Amino acid sequence: MKITSSSAIQKPAMPPTTRELAAALGVSHNTVARALRNDPEIALATKNRILKAAEEAGYRMNPLVSALMNRVRRRGKLESSGEVIGFLTSYTREDRWRTHPSLSEHYRGAHTRAEELGFQLEPFWLGTGGVDSARVGRVLRARGIRGAIIGPVLADYHPFRLDWDHLAVVAIGAGFRQVPVHRITHHQTTGMQTCYAHLRQFGYKRIGFVSHLSDDSRIHHLWRAGYLAAQQVHGGDRLEIFFTGSYEESEPVRSWLKREKPDAVIGTWVHPMLQELQVRIPERLGFASLDIMRAQLGQLAGIWQDNERIGAVAMDLLAGQIYRNETSLPKTPTLTHMEGTWMDGPTVRRQPGRRSP
């Protein structure tokens, strides 16, 4: 292939190889290869010249080969575990995430996918509410860690002081809004509407919703919005939402049940409390969970968010950033919504004498 200048390139029937591009442009094969993977060490003018010539010549990188070669270049050979990715948590204890129902599933999914992609996922604790994030940020930089997954956070956490200019980041959940990063979360509004619609199909008419105020804030009121919309779309009696500031106090829940007289309740953490109050489920009250854990499948009706899948896709998104050398805050962050699945379970039953809508 003859190339005298980038403007003189004629697109051949077959795209050129990187060695042909290098020979035609008078640069080394290594320079072309590094420019095509957007290596920041290549001079900008040289990189732009190579990229323009490659585009005009019809060159297209194979994304699978590109990903594989990035792994090989980082370690010198292909290994089952390679570049370290941080999994950042900020709960009250360093190991709290290991027993947290959804966060532990996020980690398992991300860890499995990281190994499949040749990375090694390692947990880092930012301190309670992120109070120790600056120190951890220095550790990440010193170890050359280029990517991190941020676990779900609350709205009132300390500002995370990380080296955002040298870190590719994906945050799990709707709560992290401190800086513009790519995020992935379950589609909470759709999950709520799906729950409500299925309960209506079972014949429930007075469907209530119980939520903790911190959960409502963390997901930016998306469950609340979905519940109010579902009442309008799917009908049924309009009950007052029960918001509480305590996961422990059951008497306010008892009072709400007595006042509103629901025949079904949508929630998450409230199911054990209903059992403590000796509410007969499903005979007296139907219950649908907005977040069924894997261990609860077959025990509860409601939405299975598949948190392991969310963790895996978070790792996919992060790997893409690393392969493209996108290690800084994006100008326009993306929000990926994952759909949940309705799961039948023994906590609901068809209501006698009532037709489904």
Residue positions per predicted region:
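N-terminal helix-turn-helix DNA-binding module of bacterial transcription factors
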Residues: 1-77, 357
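Hydrophobic alpha-helical segments within soluble ligand-binding/sensing domains
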Residues: 182-209, 249-254, 304-326
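An alpha-beta-alpha
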Residues: 195-234, 327-349
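Amphipathic helical "hinge" segments at domain boundaries
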Residues: 12, 59-136, 213, 225-229
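Periplasmic-binding protein-like
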Residues: 86-87, 144-152, 206-211, 242-243, ...
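Flexible loop/hinge segments that line or gate small-molecule binding clefts
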Residues: 151-191, 289-301
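Short beta-strand elements in bilobed, periplasmic/extracellular small-molecule ligand-binding domains
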Residues: 114-127, 179, 208-210, 221-249
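Flexible loop/turn connectors
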Residues: 254-357
